[in-house]
Amino acid sequence: MKIAFIHSDKKIRTGAQFINDLIACKLREKGVEVNNFYPQFLLTDTPAHFKGVNNILFFYSLLEKREEILRHDIIQGTTYTPLAFLRFSKPVVSHFGSTTIGFLRAVPKTNLLENGCSDVFFRLKQSGAIRELNIKTRRPLNDIASIEQYAAERADYVIATSNIVKNDLIGVGIAAEKIEVIHNAIEDYWFETPNANLENSATLVFLGRIGEDPFTLKLKGVDRLISLFERFPEVDKFSVVMSRNKKLIQWMRDNIPNHSIAVNAVKDAIPALLKKYAGGIALLTSRYEGFSLSLVEAMSQGLVPISFSVGIAPEIIRNEKNGFIVHTLDEAEEKINLLLKNPALRHRLSLSAKETAKQFRSDAMIEKMLALYKKILE
């Protein structure tokens, strides 16, 4: 079995890149030949509102490698990346870890943010940590959302990483019967961390990519995170963040009390960074996630999640069993207070969260992938 993987190669890596690498590695261990194909030439002088079209043309440039790619049994890409190969006879699988339409629906303009969150953005702008309150245009995102829909319609099969992603796709007219929900997995090393002693005093922990532009910052709920951190000035806080915005990182260091930050840490070094916070509280403040690897990663290290209802969270978190799902900042504050005052509850939920994360070992994901491939090639 030969699989052609089509995706982008980025300097600061996102969940999609890590998942692509993990899938390819584990498929090779099962004897599958997997070859990666990356477009090489991106137009650099196009105006901002052409960015979506630019990305689409970027992947069409792979047609120069069409003979090599078409020698594979299956062509798989992330959302619209296999676009150029939809018209050929080879089966195409489009893998959706999230949807751009989901982003667009979840992220309001800054002046419409809830419960004081707008004020956080105004302060960041005033201090120079961010340059603008809203992105100049959503046209590129709308272009990408349209082409994602087109790619999903034309692909032979679509993989969705959660029920939220599946529902996004059904909502734009993709047939439910061609969508296979296959949850993401986390790397094996997340399960190799020795059990740590659970501390009586809890730390508030954030793990994840926060981005640089105002749209991504709102998508990832950085304003919510800052607001929650500021409600607990005396509590220790630790963040592992992926971002190229040095001014924002410095602002978070300087203005959030009792807060330490690790920036752009090497992925396999993160379990060791989190180990001493086992029994602490992990905050997931995003307005939209397709899956949220960082949620599962935090749970695997014995952190108790308090998460908004995004990504995989509503499928795996059970209130007062292994964490809490919340819908407002006030509710999140209430749950944080509950856990801070009740170490016994926090320790019980910590152990349950760690057990829940074991569902997301890579073996389960790869078996489902292989079953889908065999079905396609029957």
Named regions from a protein language model:
Residues 249-281:
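Nucleotide-activated donor-binding/catalytic signature segment of Leloir-type glycosyltransferases, i.e.
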Residues 319-330, 338-344, 358:
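Conserved acidic donor-binding segment of nucleotide-sugar-dependent glycosyltransferases
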Residues 338, 345-359, 367-371, 375:
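A short, well-ordered alpha-helix in the C-terminal region of glycosyltransferases
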Residues 287:
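Aromatic "clamp/platform" in nucleotide-sugar-dependent glycosyltransferases that forms part
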Residues 281-284, 304-307:
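Short hydrophobic beta-strand element within catalytic cores of glycosyltransferases
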Residues 197-220, 226-230:
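Conserved donor-binding/catalytic core segment of Leloir-type glycosyltransferases
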Residues 170-171, 176-177, 181, 185-202, ...:
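Acidic anion/phosphate-binding donor-loop and adjacent secondary structure
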Residues 116-158:
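Membrane-proximal helix-turn-helix segments that form the acceptor-binding/catalytic region
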